[in-house]
Amino acid sequence: MNRNPLSPKTGMNRFVVFAFLLAFVICFAMAAPVQAQFTLVKISTDSFHNSYSQHKTEVEPDTYSWGSTMVAAFQVARVADGGGADLGFATSTDSGTTWTYGYLPGLTVNYKGGSNSAASDASVVYDAKYGVWLISSLPISNSGVNVAVSRSKDGLHWDNPIMVDSSGGDDKNWITCDNNAKSKFYGNCYQEWDTPEIMISTSTDGGLTWGAAKTSADGAFGSGAEPLVQPNGQVVVTFLGNNMQAFTSTNGGKTWGSSFTIANVNTFQGSSSLRSVGLPFPSTGIDKSGKLYVVWSDCSFRQNCATNDLVISTSTNGTKWTAPARIPIDALNSTVDHFIPGLGVDRATSGTTAHLTATYYFYPQANCDDSTCRVHVGFTTSTDGGKTWTAGKDLGAGAMQISWLPASQNGPMLADYLSSSYVNGKAFGVFMVAKAPSGGLFNEAAYTTKQPLEASADEPRFSSRGEKRIPGVHADRPFPNTQGEERESPSAPPGKQLQK
């Protein structure tokens, strides 16, 4: 009789039990984001008192970094019918350690001589050739919604806006610049918006003047477009049309090619009225080598489209893209609903060692409604070009109630997009945090973290390799369909089909 407790049979049984328990622990650990130890820093506040805003609110941030400077821009004092009393900025000139905030002058009637009632959709970039920061905006007035750009030499002092387009029917603007010194088009800046036809104007003088708006060769319709510039000067514009789509220019924006599909898109919208939960706008980034990354929310990996994951697709040439891969923030059987991602890519890294960070909003329980849904802010990071990711972490912004958020035409609002940026190798996200209203005012503002968003060297990384999109999965209902500044999804005019 063999009494050895480590006999082959007994040892194998123990190994099986250990493996089972280990798998259980990993799945349990990934079931919901872990509370991270971060100190939140409020970087701006709503100081306006105009009668038509919902005060003590800030929504919808974008960020960009260059050198030791990082600039965030966002709406301040949200107006229910669209935009904010003005656009605000928050700037750090010491790699995210301290922040200075203010408002863009001359943009609205609420600050330093503007003529517009509101402004929306901030997008920020730096033009390295001309040494100027640019914030793109949508000025809103009785005559419609236009596109403008504000300039600054230091990210702290801003000039009055320069009008880019005054057609009056614009939405979802985005701006980028060619900061590749060896590119033939170094210094070109590209301003995008939709009508909902995707339009792009080019500046060759640091945003002082802008050329006539142009479209893709096939007149693509969509929204949420984000242009990026590769080292050779090729501009790649990703956008949400009927699916995730893109088109390119290889001649500095003189002409644009026809649009093509990156991937089909399906999203879970659920039962809450929170704006943009089921809206898969792309969030994009580019590494040092010119590799492109696009992230969006998608339910295609979940049976019956039960909840949204974040998914990622990449391209080295702008025209051929990888099949979407699920970012393994948590396990496939989790109940977490992930939405509104903000991707940051460290432009000093590349390829298999590229550093990526994604911030996002999430519901711990996807099957919730306005009375039970609680919004959290999370993040995940990768140091191998998106091959593996850390488990999702809750940044500790609290469990935000839907009733704490300002109204928009399409529901209570945090954002249509988020943003993260790397400054000197350290990732920071800017996001909106809402607390319980007080004294008849909201309590929502722009925040970041004191510590950079990073993981320890020994923190587990997870891969979704081998996971497949489930055939036949479809969105629980069509994307939200609205018009004007508040249009959350692409909409073609009568008789015109969205381009595929």
Segments (PLM) and residue ranges:
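N-terminal secretory signal peptides that target proteins for export/translocation
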Residues: M1-R14
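Residue-level detector of alpha-helical hydrophobic segments embedded in or interacting with membranes
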Residues: R3, C27-F28, K56
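Leucine-biased recognition of intrinsically disordered, low-complexity hydrophobic segments
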Residues: L6, L21-L22, L498
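Hydrophobic alpha-helical segments, principally membrane-spanning helices and signal/leader peptides
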Residues: M12, V16-F18, V79, R302
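Bacterial N-terminal signal peptides
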Residues: F18-A29
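Sec/Tat signal peptide C-region and signal peptidase I cleavage site
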Residues: M30-A36
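C-terminal PAP-associated
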Residues: A36-K500
